[in-house]
Amino acid sequence: MSGTAEENTREVEAGVVTDFTREMSYGEYLHLDELLAAQHPLSTPEHHDELLFIVQHQTSELWLKLVLHELRSAMRAIAADDLKTALKNIARVKHIQRTLTEQWSVLATLTPTEYAQFRGFLANSSGFQSQQYRAVEFALGNKNAKMLDVFAHDGPGHAQLTELLEAPSLYDEFLRHLARRGHDVPAELLERDVTKAHVHTPALVATFRVIYEDAQRYWTEYEACEELVDLEENFQLWRFRHLKTVERTIGFKRGTGGSSGVGFLARALDLTFFPELYAVRTEIGS
């Protein structure tokens, strides 16, 4: 028995606003005209799958913008000894990380044959040049002043990275917070050159062991430690999915930005933000 079109149509309620001559619309609030006009495939003739490649990376950049927003808030909160706010920020970052990691499954639908037909139009542009990705790494403590050279052409981007390079990282702020709470944090870490990457410090492992083995007493610190481990693990999962997506798409070709490609990405898996939080696991209960 067939129905009617009216039965399968939702009526617009009387209270729904339809006149936007004097009101701000959804599209205006989000600046959708500019956002949806920002995809400019360069392949000639235009290749169908280049739009996928562009949208994948543009949406990633939007999520990275939000990650930075939340990490900056978390660092300010920790500096003010407001760990509850910081943990809320970090929880949101973790959800964004999972979204970013899952997005690789969309790009993985791009076959090697399809990508090869427009890859040459990328010239030397590469995700390695993502200023926001580098900013996230700096905020988490993986700092390298040489990376600034890549952004010499980008005044505002270079300035933001310089600011993050010279500021304490999320981990630096957390260790300072622990010291203010009376935990035994080595002075060398509290006074270190924050423009350098954090180096594994065995003496700090003992401090974390105290927290982990008396979690009820130090519950807030314990919870924060586990949140940081989640943060790093999610980041490593993103790196791994990136590597495997690149491998299945271009094999072991060199990257468009001049890197060795998969080999270069694989070495990033050895980098760590919070090494003592992993090292302490060997010590607990022993």
Swiss-Prot record:
Heme binds at H242. It catalyses: L-tryptophan + O2 = N-formyl-L-kynurenine. Gene3D superfamilies: 1.20.58.480. Its cofactor is heme. Substrate binds at F53, I54, V55, Q56, H57, Y115, R119, T256. Coiled coil: none annotated. GO terms for molecular function: heme binding; metal ion binding; tryptophan 2,3-dioxygenase activity. The keyword DNA damage does not apply. One of its GO terms (biological process) is L-tryptophan catabolic process to kynurenine. Keywords: Dioxygenase, Heme, Iron, Metal-binding, Oxidoreductase, Tryptophan catabolism. Its EC number is 1.13.11.11. Pathway: Amino-acid degradation; L-tryptophan degradation via kynurenine pathway; L-kynurenine from L-tryptophan: step 1/2. Binds 1 heme group per subunit. Heme-dependent dioxygenase that catalyzes the oxidative cleavage of the L-tryptophan (L-Trp) pyrrole ring and converts L-tryptophan to N-formyl-L-kynurenine. Catalyzes the oxidative cleavage of the indole moiety. Homotetramer. Belongs to the tryptophan 2,3-dioxygenase family. This is Tryptophan 2,3-dioxygenase. The gene is kynA.
